[in-house]
Curated annotation (Swiss-Prot):
Lineage of the species this protein comes from: Bacteria, Bacillati, Actinomycetota, Actinomycetes, Micrococcales
Binding-site residues, [4Fe-4S] cluster 1: 55, 60, 66, 292
GO molecular function: 4 iron, 4 sulfur cluster binding; lipoate synthase activity; metal ion binding
Enzyme Commission number(s): 2.8.1.8
Location of this chain's protein in the cell: Cytoplasm
Gene Ontology cellular component annotations, sorted alphabetically: cytoplasm
Cofactor remark: Binds 2 [4Fe-4S] clusters per subunit. One cluster is coordinated with 3 cysteines and an exchangeable S-adenosyl-L-methionine.
NCBIfam families: lipA, PRK05481.1, PRK12928.1
Cofactor (UniProt): [4Fe-4S] cluster
Pathway it works in: Protein modification; protein lipoylation via endogenous pathway; protein N(6)-(lipoyl)lysine from octanoyl-[acyl-carrier-protein]: step 2/2
Designated name of the protein: Lipoyl synthase
Catalytic activity: [[Fe-S] cluster scaffold protein carrying a second [4Fe-4S](2+) cluster] + N(6)-octanoyl-L-lysyl-[protein] + 2 oxidized [2Fe-2S]-[ferredoxin] + 2 S-adenosyl-L-methionine + 4 H(+) = [[Fe-S] cluster scaffold protein] + N(6)-[(R)-dihydrolipoyl]-L-lysyl-[protein] + 4 Fe(3+) + 2 hydrogen sulfide + 2 5'-deoxyadenosine + 2 L-methionine + 2 reduced [2Fe-2S]-[ferredoxin]
Protein source organism: Micrococcus luteus (strain ATCC 4698 / DSM 20030 / JCM 1464 / CCM 169 / CCUG 5858 / IAM 1056 / NBRC 3333 / NCIMB 9278 / NCTC 2665 / VKM Ac-2230)
Main location: cytoplasm
Amino acid sequence: MSLAPEGRRLLRVEARNAEVPVERKPEWIKAKVHMGPEYIGLKNKVKSAGLHTVCEEAGCPNIFECWEDREATFLIGGDICTRRCDFCDITSGKPRPLDMEEPQKVAENIREMDLRYATVTGVARDDQKDGAAWLYAETIRRIHALNPGTGVEILPPDFGAVPELVQQVFDARPEVFAHNLETVPRIFKRIRPAFTYEKSLRVLTMAKADGLVTKSNLILGMGEEDHEIDQALVDLHESGCDIITITQYVRPSKLHHPIDRWVKPQEFVQWSQRAEEIGFQGVMAGPLVRSSYRAGKLYAQAMQRLGRTLPENLAHLAGEKTARQEASAVVAQMS
C-alpha cells in the first residue's frame, strides 16, 4: 500500500499522479535573486518579530521584488483545507478550530511590516456554517482599521456562491476582490473537484455588481488547449473580471497533477496581448508570475483605466514599478 508523506493512504488520483516522474524545469523558470535595502530591512524585521507570511513559508521566488516594494501575502483560516485541488500544495483534511483572534494578528503583522499592499488568501472552510466568510471580512476590517495606508486584496474560496456569504466579504470593502478560476471547463472537474467553473464566474460577477475591483488567475500547463484559454479569458471578462494574471503550473510534488507542458515566455507575451485586446484593465502574465505578484501595481493600473481616482491614503501605489517576472521582461532578459 502506498502512503503519503504524512503517513495516510494515497488517494487514487495521487497514486495515478505519482506514476509520472517530476518534470525538470526549463532555464526560464529559475528566478534571479535581487536583494535591495527594503527587502533586507523587511526580512530582518519579520525574523526579529516572529512574523509569518505565505511569501516565506511557500518559498515564493518573487519575494525579493515584492518585499522591496513592501507587498506581502498572508494565509488565514489555518493550514488545512476542506477541499483538494490537484495543483495545490496545501494539505486537505479536517481542519482545526478557527482562531478568532487571527484577523487582529494579521493586521498587527502588517503594521509591524509597514506594508503598502497586502494580499490575504485562505483555505476553504466548508466545516463552518458561513464557510468562514466572517473571518475573511473581519480580517479586511481589522487591516483597514489598523493600517489605513495599506491596500487590501482578498482572495477567498467561492463560499458556494451563496449571495449572503459573499456579501459579508463585499461589505468589508477590500480594494480588490479576487477569486481564481485557475483552469478551463474541460479539465476543471479533474483539477478542482470541489469547485465549479460556473460558480467561480458567478462570484466574480456578484463582486463586480457590488462595485468592487475584481481579479482572477489562470494557470497554464495542466492540459488546456489554446482555444480553451482564449474562451476562459472571454468568460472571465464577460463575468466582470477587471484584472487577470496568467501563470505557469509548477508541480509541488509527484502526488500532484503532472505538468502537461512548459509554456515559453514568448507565448505568455501573446496571452498578455490577447487579454489586453479582450479588455482587461490590468494584465500580468509570465512563467513565474503568481496571482498576488505586483498586486498593488495592478490595482493602481486598473483604477486608472476604470476612470477611478485612487483614495488619498493609497496614492503611493501609483507610478511605474518594476515587474521582472512579466513575460516581456523575461524575454528581454533571455536575449
